[in-house]
Structure formats: structure tokens, C-alpha cells
């Protein structure tokens, strides 16, 4: 019945700050869409929609709180390269590299947080 995930939505206090961070730090591409100029961040065949907390015409989960997401991104880079890049941009790695099990099997992951506190995992299947 299901074949994949199209997008996820992050409830945000500061849309511009979040969009800027994901563009500059992770290299995601900003997309403005819809009549009310919603902001999404695209990468590969996926996207993250940034929803302002309190948006009246945009349905969301029952708890409208920033910093509650836990997202795993996949990289084809060596994690040592990713760590060096993130450190250069001032991002604190809070855990890793550590072994994890992803949807395709064993992977190695590092963890950091976005500006509003959501947990971001960056994983590689190529390091095992």
C-alpha cells in the first residue's frame, strides 16, 4: 500500500532562521510554494515543509511545538568529512559516530540539533 515518504513538516517559531540554517549548514534547497508562500526545503526526492507555529490554515499534529522532530538524513560522504564540514560551520556534534540500524541495515551515524532543538541524525551506509 505505501511506498515511501514524500515530506515531513517541522513546526517552527522562526521560519526564516530555520530555512537559512538548513540551506547554509546542510545544503538543502529552499522552495516557496502555495498561495500563502509556504517554505519547504528540498533534497533528493524529499522535502521538509516549515510550518509557522499558530498557522491557521495549515493542519498539523495535536502538539504544536518546535524542536520535537527526530530526522535521519543519509549521506554518501565519509562521516569524517561531514563532521569536519559541520564543525567548520559551528555545529556541535552531540553523539557519534555510533553504529545504528536503518531501513537498509547497518549504518554509522552522528547527531546534532537544528536551531530550534530538533534532533538530526546524519548516517552513512558506506562506513560499515
Please provide the spans of the model-predicted regions:
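Conserved beta-strand-loop-alpha-helix junction that forms the acyl-donor binding cleft
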Residues: 12-14
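Short, conserved charged micro-motifs
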Residues: 17-19, 78-83
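Short glycine-/small-residue motifs
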Residues: 119-122
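Vicinal oxygen chelate
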Residues: 1-4, 28-76, 83-113, 125-128
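Conserved active-site tyrosine of GNAT-family acetyltransferases
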Residues: 18-25, 86, 117
